[in-house]
């Protein structure tokens, strides 16, 4: 992580632009109608804001993660203090909302509100009562990746649990999973256990693997 934090901003922007170009050419992206994209942290990972803009401009439905105020069952005091145990993917309606309607959590990550401006509940991708109908594609963040689908997350297991939920809710049509990596994030092998979910595709500035 220390190495990633030292990558200059201009270098992240250059690599991110190449990554986004490759994502836009993926068949799983072209086919997808509902797309979940993580919003990048200030440093150390592929910047996804431009990808989010593309999703909205192309008429696809965009969902981004919300971590706070989502509780599923009992959690330890530390986990409850740090963050809730799970995340939800909530729909962003338009570019205006993406650019100006989000708030930043303590990690410097932008998040959507639970409700829209008119007070109605925001659409949750996995909650049919809010209009959600599942996801076609999930764009994954991480700290390190290998070329075999291995992904090292930030240690809290949010995405592994979320992917498990989507597979249970969408057994006939699980979402495609695409991880985005800077060159500095690619390693020989990422250790993983049974709880870790492998990703279908890894996209780097140099192509898709």
Residue map of PLM features:
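N-terminal active-site beta-alpha-beta segment that forms phosphate/nucleotide-binding
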Residues: 1-133
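Surface-exposed, charge/polar-rich loops and edge strands
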Residues: 2-6, 110-143, 147-150, 160-209
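Internal, well-ordered alpha-helical segments in soluble enzyme and binding-protein domains
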Residues: 15, 19, 158-159, 198
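A residue-level signal for conserved active-site and pocket-lining positions in enzyme catalytic cores
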Residues: 37, 62, 139, 155, ...
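Short Gly/Thr/Asp-enriched flexible loops that form oxyanion-binding sites at enzyme active sites
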Residues: 46-53, 148-164
